[in-house]
Amino acid sequence: MKKSTAFTTRLITFTAMMTALVMVSGFIPPLEIPPIGRIYWCDGVIFLGCFLFAPLPSFIIGGMGTFLYDLLLGNTVMMLPSLVIHGLQAFIVSFLLHKVFPKKQEPLFAFSACLVGAAIVIAGYFLTRILVQNRGLDYALIRMPSDVIQEAAGIAAALLICYGLRLKTALTKSGLLPEVSVRKNSWEKQDLSSDKKEEITEENTSDDKNDGKEI
């Protein structure tokens, strides 16, 4: 019971910290690119959370972090879209990385998962500007390059911090990172089970051959 409680407390604490970090990163002065727009930093923090945590905590980090940012900013129109878009982004990226893709060559598969998450964000904000903000198709198309650059910058920053600076490795070795985010995925288990089956069949065939020789 004590181990389970400590694990739950650690997971909740890390999730709350990352959620707050996403919210605070939204208030950091953005990078101004006059022809395109502003590049915010919150996407990099969201992708980093996806690398470190399981799908459900990642959903909370991405969705609630941006939701609280819009709430404090007074942008009530975007609160729900931010929750859905960034929550889905974080959940899908984490799910692909920890549950679908094999653990070998993780940085490469992390990049692939981030591309899917970036597509979700770009499509989500494209539809939001048309359907929720009523800005029209032209405005949505004009803002799309800004979203693409922002997602690219977020992916690059998250990959650099997590794998380039070996943050995930350091947290895992120190025991601070909750185990649910680094457990083996189903592909590895299937590979191990298939290897065991092959070994068993090889042993059986060799036994049959030996029996035949003895006869």
Task: Indicate residue ranges for each PLM-predicted region.
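Loop-helix junctions at membrane interfaces
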Residues: 1-215
